[in-house]
Regions:
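Helix-breaking motifs and short loop linkers at transmembrane-helix boundaries and internal kinks
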Residues: 51, 83, 104-110, 248, ...
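Conserved MFS/SLC helix-loop-helix module at the cytosolic interface between two early adjacent transmembrane helices
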Residues: 70-109
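Helix-loop-helix hairpin linking two adjacent transmembrane segments in secondary transporters
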Residues: 110, 139-193, 238, 242
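Cytoplasmic helix-loop-helix junction between adjacent transmembrane helices
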Residues: 114-152
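Intracellular juxtamembrane helix-capping segments at the cytosolic ends
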Residues: 125-137, 321-334
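C-terminal transmembrane helical hairpin of 12-TM major facilitator-type secondary transporters
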Residues: 282-326
């Protein structure tokens, strides 16, 4: 065999190994996101079982989100220099142990602890998984690799949460957490067996990494993510209510419409990963425009089921495409501290999700449910303006 053939074979083998590792990271992401959001469908059952109100049970969701937002960036900055393979395995074992603790919890305080611990680990996973996927795939395929990892989010939203809720109805909410315990441990084992060792990045101090927070271009990209997630979840949070109360869809059928929304989102995930590599800010503006069109057209289209379905296809594709677009765009804005940048984007996304839900709720209270899509579309258009100004700022800096 010639040296050229040997080199080609070695490159092919490395590519196959990298692809397998990225796929398993996506599966691990599926388990982690399911762990985060499955509890939403379990709240009534666990509230009854633990003898607490549904509002108090709902604080478990708030606890998780705020923990991710507050602790994610400093923890990721401190741990970003560690061996990635070991980091992922430890995180998945933490999720396994936490889910087991949730399954045996006898009161809300134990369950709160079982939610607090994995919330500390989740942003570290997403920050390092995104950067690791980029390293494994190489700079030319970084966007597609991050999109593949983010496919775990889409799959969890589409299959994990509804199927997990059905599973919990059959075997109880504790059984659902036991299932997640086993899946988390399985993902840790698969990564241990398949992922190549990735050389730790040079240890950079917190002060050095935090310098990205003084970079106007990076901060503009972070603000852009907050605006986009505010727009996305300002309307998406109330989509089920919109389908039922405005479109007149039977409650038993709303779930299938939401499943369809998630299914077309898989297309958006692939498109976002493809185009963000070519133009991070350009792809942001394009999909933000589609998002605004979809959200604002949802109420006018509600009188026709075929037209509504077409609008939701546009909305669903744009909504899911913006997940990998935001992540890789923010990471590209801080190449010297990508893990911290990725985690800051996760925190920004959580801030946007919370802010969007609040804005949507206030819109319903003062303007009615039918105005939610329009208000969210205005925020999306504002994000386009910010993206355009950020692009101009980058072009001026390059001169």
């Amino acid at each position: 065999m010639s040296s050229q053939e040997t080199t080609s074979a070695a490159a092919s083998e490395r590519s196959t190994g990298a692809g397998l590792s990225i796929t398993i990271l996506a599966l691990a992401g599926f388990v982690i996101v399911t762990t985060e959001f499955l509890i939403i469908g379990l709240l009534p059952a666990l509230a009854r079982d633990l003898g607490i109100s549904i509002s108090n049970a709902g604080l478990l969701v708030t606890l998780f989100a705020f923990t991710v937002m507050l602790f994610g960036p400093p923890l990721t900055a401190m741990l970003s220099h560690l061996d990635r393979k070991r980091t992922f395995i430890v995180i998945l074992l933490i999720f396994a142990a936490s889910n087991a603790l949730a399954a045996v919890s006898s009161n809300i305080w134990v369950l709160a602890l079982a939610r607090f611990i994995p919330a500390l680990a989740l942003p570290v996973f997403w920050g390092t998984a995104s950067e690791t996927a980029s390293l494994l795939a190489g700079p030319k395929r970084a966007g597609k690799a991050v999109a593949q990892v983010y496919l775990g989010i889409s799959a969890a939203m589409l299959f994990g949460i509804p199927l997990g809720t059905v599973f919990a109805d059959a075997v109880g909410w504790r059984g659902a957490f036991w299932a997640l315990t086993l899946l988390s441990a399985l993902m840790a084992l698969l990564l241990a067996l398949s992922m190549p060792r990735i050389e730790p990045t040079a240890k950079v101090g917190l002060v050095e990494q935090a310098k990205i927070l003084r970079d106007p271009f990076f901060l503009a990209n972070l603000l852009l993510s907050i605006l986009l997630f505010t727009a996305m979840f300002g309307a998406y949070t109330y989509l089920a209510d919109t389908l039922e109360r405005i479109a007149g869809i039977e409650p038993a059928q709303v779930g299938w419409w939401l499943m369809g929304f998630g299914a077309v989102g898989l297309i958006g995930n692939a498109l976002g990963g493809r185009y963000v590599d070519r133009s991070p800010l350009g792809s942001t503006m394009a999909f933000a425009l589609l998002l605004a069109l979809g959200m604002s057209a949802s109420v006018p289209a509600a009188g026709s089921m075929p037209l509504l379905a077409m609008v939701l296809v546009i909305w669903g594709i744009a909504h899911t495409a913006l997940f990998p677009i935001c992540q890789i765009r923010v990471m590209k804005a801080a190449p010297q501290a990508q893990a911290l940048a990725g985690t800051l984007n996760v925190s920004a996304a959580n801030a946007g999700i919370g802010l969007g839900s609040i804005i949507g709720g206030l819109t319903i209270e003062h303007l009615g449910l039918g105005a939610v899509g329009y208000v969210a579309a205005v925020v999306a258009l504002l994000s386009i303006a910010v993206a355009w100004m950020t692009s101009m700022q980058k072009n001026r800096a390059a001169l």
